[in-house]
A protein has these predicted regions:
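A short alpha-helical cap/connector motif
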Residues: 1-103, 110-131, 135-193
Length: 193
């Protein structure tokens, strides 16, 4: 995995931070998660880490960037995980998924978090979880004085809108975990399943 981590760092490709991925791996183990939908593959790092936990785990992951998709396909085959990981080339905005999943992991365009959450929540099994990464945006969400560009401000505002969406969501209860770039763990409340 060091090789993928170094490649991502050198090529400025966002992958989940080390303590975040370790938390995610432990969560998957503790909750006996077997079927995962990942929105945003990048180079396949998270999928490879999750699939490596157990040979019974099956992952469907979606990536819209062709170069990253091709690299993810290469990496998944390199680690002999192509039987466990199904990678789809396409935009998760337009991709229709029919499977049901124990875990939906959203790690894609931050401005689309609400859309992805709403679109894919019906692919969640009873008792399933939606985990969303990058809710701190490198500390900019908590400290707006650090925001330097209009683009950053737009992303920060969309993340704040998403956090408000989660906080006011009657269907899902959400817990925020300060690991990596901050993650949200959202579980459907009883009575909504």
């Amino acid at each position: 995995m060091k090789e993928l981590e170094e490649y991502a760092k050198i090529n400025n490709i966002p992958i989940m931070q080390k303590d975040g991925i370790l938390y995610l791996i432990n969560y998957i183990k503790e909750n006996n998660i077997k079927n995962i939908l990942e929105i945003g593959s990048a180079i396949g790092y998270s999928s490879i880490m999750m699939a490596s936990i157990n040979s019974d785990i099956r992952i469907t992951t979606i990536e819209r960037d062709k170069d990253r998709y091709d690299l993810a396909v290469f990496n998944i085959k390199k680690y002999n995980l192509d039987k466990q990981i199904n990678i789809i080339y396409g935009d998760a905005v337009d991709t229709d998924i029919t499977g049901m999943y124990d875990l939906i992991f959203i790690d894609a365009a931050k401005g689309k978090n609400i859309f992805f959450f709403e679109k894919y929540k019906n692919n969640l099994v009873k008792g399933g979880t939606i985990i969303t990464d990058n809710l701190s945006f490198h500390g900019l969400v908590e400290d707006s004085d650090l925001v330097k560009t209009k683009n950053q401000r737009g992303i920060v505002n969309k993340i704040k809108d998403f956090i408000s969406f989660l906080d006011n969501n009657e269907e899902f209860a959400t817990e925020y975990i300060p690991v990596g770039d901050k993650i949200a763990i959202s579980k459907r409340r009883s009575g909504y399943e």
